[in-house]
Structure formats: structure tokens, C-alpha cells
Amino acid sequence: MADHHRGATGGGGGYGDLQRGGGMHGEAQQQQKQGAMMTALKAATAATFGGSMLVLSGLILAGTVIALTVATPVLVIFSPVLVPAAIALALMAAGFVTSGGLGVAALSVFSWMYKYLTGKHPPAADQLDHAKARLASKARDVKDAAQHRIDQAQGS
């Protein structure tokens, strides 16, 4: 801010600065004054902003108290209607959310099945093929064991 008083060479305190009582010592005093002014300006801004917020919070508190004072008798009178209505709305919202979630799950299952049946190899298709092979193997083992027991029963 004080750069416009310096010479064209951009040096520190020149001869003119010394005549005005400046020099290096005067420049330090000026910077100290500017720092103090900036601190005072910041403090004033913070106090103004903080005071405004304090006033607004007081007004909001007063408005809340007034609104509760007015609304409490109305809520007490209508509570036999409002409480069941709120419960019904909550149940309806839960039903819609559940329905939507199950619908999305069904669509994803149908999409996976379509990809699997058309041979596009969806995620976990290898696991399904492995499980299918193990199930078929176990079914053959059960069939062979049953056939063996039938043959033993007929042979005895």
C-alpha cells in the first residue's frame, strides 16, 4: 500500500523518506499502524456479523415459542386424527418404497436371466454353471444309489 511513495528504482527508504521522518523505521511504524487498523477492521466486522446472527437467532427463538404456543392447542385437539393419519402415511410410504425396491430387484434378475440365456455371460454365470454341474452330479449319485438298493431288494 505504501509502495507509491518509493522511488522508481523500487528501493526502500530514499532521501525523501528520510526527510519525512521515514526511512526503514518510519516504514515499520506505518506497517504496524496498517496491521492494527486491519485487526480493528476484522474485529468490527466480526462483531457486526456476530451481533446480527445473535439478533436473528433471538428472533427465530421468539418465533418458535410463539408458533408452539399457537400450535399446541390445535395439535392436542386434532391428535386423535393426526396420529393415525401419520401412521397410515408412514405405512403407505414404506409400502411404496418396498414395492419399488422389489420391482428394481425383479428387473435386475430378469436382465441377468436374459443375458445368461442369450449367452452374454453375466456376472457369476460361472458359479451358476458350477453349481448346476454339482447338482446334476449329486442327482446322478442319488439315482445310482436308489437303483442299487432297488436291485438289492429285488435280488434278495
UniProtKB/Swiss-Prot annotation:
Keywords: Acetylation, Lipid droplet, Membrane, Transmembrane, Transmembrane helix. GO terms for biological process: lipid storage; post-embryonic development; reproductive structure development. The modification N-acetylalanine is found at residue 2. It is a multi-pass membrane protein. The keyword Membrane applies. Residues 43-114 are annotated as: Hydrophobic. Residues 8-25 have a biased composition (Gly residues). Belongs to the oleosin family. PANTHER family: OLEOSIN, OLEOSIN 18.5 KDA. This is Oleosin Zm-I. It comes from Zea mays.
